[in-house]
């Protein structure tokens, strides 16, 4: 049997959950996950067994699972240990690479019921917003300032300028560009003043719409995944918003931009070399 330690926010949890399910499928070895009321982190983080991930509830157990631990040795992708269908193992780490689960992506999303989740959100939104005609734009501010300032950086305006310029070269000329932007509610004023107004002034053919603050965080992630193209922040949250929007070979031709600086420069041990699929575009600030 296989299990995994769940930790961090929604983006981190999805890496861990997708990895353990893919590992289980590869070796035909069942998995379980310990049910916890919240996710261990430096701040209180929700878990999503009662909403977004409710289809996985049948795999939860109410007691600690004490199996031999495989500790992720590096942030770079490493092949997980070969096991039999009777071995017991606990995965511990972040597993931040699509390479851990990309082969089984479609099967896992079916198990989660992701198509139904998307349809439910579309019905909830009605005609208020049409994300399929919009570019998702993510700003990550608050948790970096409050908690992660030694590990992460706030992405500068120049990155977003360069990302929009890149997308302009890929879409039909004179096509109005609609951007649906995401940030924490407490960062709204800062984002408008320091990003949205300057971007609006620079790109006359763009319009900006704020994703509703009344949506749950997981609903915002699903909404992000419904967008036509994506401009990521240095965040696993928007990484998943883009990844869930694409099929494995990106036949839907989505443009996905991510910043060249993901972590603080002093965090030299946390490599992101295996984080991004090859068809995503790195944009310099």
Question: Could you tell me what each predicted segment is?
Answer:
Residues 1-3:
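Extreme N-terminal starter segment of soluble prokaryotic enzymes
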Residues 6-15:
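A short, glycine/small-residue-rich beta-strand->loop->alpha-helix junction that serves as a flexible
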Residues 10, 175-249, 253-264:
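Donor-binding and catalytic core of enzymes assembling or modifying cell-surface/extracellular glycoconjugates
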Residues 12, 39-45, 99-100, 144-147, ...:
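Short catalytic/ligand-binding loop motif for oxyanion handling, primarily in non-cytosolic enzymes
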Residues 16-23:
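Short amphipathic alpha-helix
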Residues 36-177, 276, 285:
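Secretory-pathway luminal glycosyltransferase catalytic domains
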Residues 264-285:
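Leloir-type glycosyltransferase catalytic cores
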């Amino acid at each position: 049997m296989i299990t995994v330690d769940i930790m961090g926010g929604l983006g981190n949890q999805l890496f861990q959950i997708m990895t353990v399910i893919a590992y289980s499928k590869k070796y035909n070895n069942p998995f379980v996950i310990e049910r916890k009321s919240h996710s261990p982190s430096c701040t209180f983080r929700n878990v999503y067994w009662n909403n977004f991930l409710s289809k996985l509830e049948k795999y939860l157990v109410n007691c600690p699972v004490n199996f031999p631990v495989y500790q992720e040795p590096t942030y770079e992708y490493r092949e997980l240990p070969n096991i039999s269908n009777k071995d017991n193992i606990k995965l511990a780490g972040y597993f931040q690479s699509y390479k851990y689960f990309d082969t089984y992506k479609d099967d896992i999303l079916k198990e989660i019921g992701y198509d139904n989740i998307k349809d439910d959100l579309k019905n909830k939104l009605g005609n208020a917003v049409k994300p399929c005609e919009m570019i998702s734009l993510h700003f990550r501010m608050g948790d970096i300032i409050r908690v992660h300032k030694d590990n992460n950086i706030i992405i500068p305006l120049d990155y977003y300028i360069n990302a929009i310029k890149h997308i302009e070269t890929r879409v039909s000329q004179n096509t109005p560009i609609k951007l649906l932007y995401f940030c924490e509610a407490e960062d709204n004023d800062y984002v408008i003043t320091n990003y949205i107004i300057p971007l609006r002034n620079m790109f006359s053919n763009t319009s900006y719409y704020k994703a509703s603050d009344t949506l749950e965080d997981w609903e915002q992630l699903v909404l992000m995944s419904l967008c036509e193209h994506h401009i990521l922040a240095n965040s696993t949250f928007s990484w998943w918003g883009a990844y869930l929007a694409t099929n494995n070979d990106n036949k839907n031709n989505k443009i996905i931009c991510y910043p060249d600086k993901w972590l603080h420069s002093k965090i030299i041990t946390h490599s992101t070399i295996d984080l991004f699929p090859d068809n995503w575009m790195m944009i310099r600030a």
